[in-house]
């Protein structure tokens, strides 16, 4: 194999990062040397590799299997939970920008003080064909209405979801149910403590009680949980009340505009209560992860798991009930900077979130998580490292707020790939400049009040409340980014050693 001599020693593979030129490679705003920033970003990547590397540790894998098995137990009690191979697990929690759920309050959790690593799990509880009359898209607000007839595919869906029904769609003047089915090129807070013997009923604005990455970023199926009371393997259940003759043709007794809707608030309430009932019945098993906290915040059920072996980690999983829609919105983009993105079939999600113009009103929001996962695989590694560093710097500034900044930062990542040359983004020595560029772009977006939606042409993502205060905090951070990165590296070192740092809501883990 041919080799090249670098500094008198043979080197196989790509050349190392070129050293920065001290007199020219300096950040004009802060005076920081870009070479130092890049080195700090690389150190941050090393310290965070325990939870974000290509080969997760055994504790992370056990925690993932625990959550999948927990959902499997819920499926045994309520077959509306999906049976198998329908889960999408993503690295990073909702508060770190894994998804856009609007500006609803998502609790006091902050990576570092409350948990060491976070993940988001999409749990499809309903699926439909986007070309039918059941789906109404409101592309102005990037939201949708899901109407339920008496029968769908021979199943009495309205009877099955009777406890989650809402009123009919108020008006359809600005809505459409147009999606195409061909393949897509892009393819109030409730809490439960397992130590108690009761499950509180979901109520709006209930205060949080005291409590003690995608690992593979792919679809996963349930596995049996470590529980002496449920040693048998998971089986797919059916309910006589839900079954109907598959050959029966739906004959709705009223027009589609009179159909009741599937209410996202009721769905998330049902999702949490069912999960909490099973969590309360779990028997701790030595060597297995321990569920120390579960709570519902808007459309998200957040659980914290403590790993059993040292170094002890506290892992956060945001579980979200979603609707899978087959088809593709007519106004959605079909190409990225890397060309068409291949997928098995055209589909997207509906997730429970808050409406952009009415933060206090819940609704189904369009979500393209599977396409974003494919996009991430096309992003150059140095730019991903720069984004991770920018996330780490942003994290303490938005902790406990309703700010949409983390997902805005993620969207800026996609627009950067559209705008900048791939060779520039792929050079390791440019990571420092890219990190500062993302933060500067975010400040401009906060000042403008909106950012163009990456997937829906002509639509915008809103910045939400608190943008002025966040702009001020970002300006202060930009005055000394090197110091902010050093603090992020130290925080990552603490998380790597094991946390359980501070209890959520003042409790202990």
UniProtKB/Swiss-Prot annotation:
The keyword Membrane applies. One of its GO terms (cellular component) is plasma membrane. Residues 167-236 are annotated as: Disordered. InterPro entries: MAB21L/cGLR. It is found in: Cell membrane. Residues 174-204 have a biased composition (Basic and acidic residues). The chain crosses the membrane at residues 313-329. It is a single-pass membrane protein. GO terms for biological process: apoptotic process; positive regulation of cell adhesion; positive regulation of T cell chemotaxis; positive regulation of T cell migration; regulation of mitochondrial outer membrane permeabilization involved in apoptotic signaling pathway; response to cytokine; signal transduction. It comes from the Eukaryota. Keywords: Apoptosis, Cell membrane, Membrane, Transmembrane, Transmembrane helix. Residues 207-224 have a biased composition (Low complexity). Residues 330-509 are cytoplasmic. Residues 1-312 are extracellular. PANTHER family: CELL FATE DETERMINING PROTEIN MAB21-RELATED, TRANSMEMBRANE PROTEIN 102. Interacts with CSF2RB; this interaction occurs preferentially in the absence of CSF2. Selectively involved in CSF2 deprivation-induced apoptosis via a mitochondria-dependent pathway. This is Transmembrane protein 102. The gene is Tmem102.
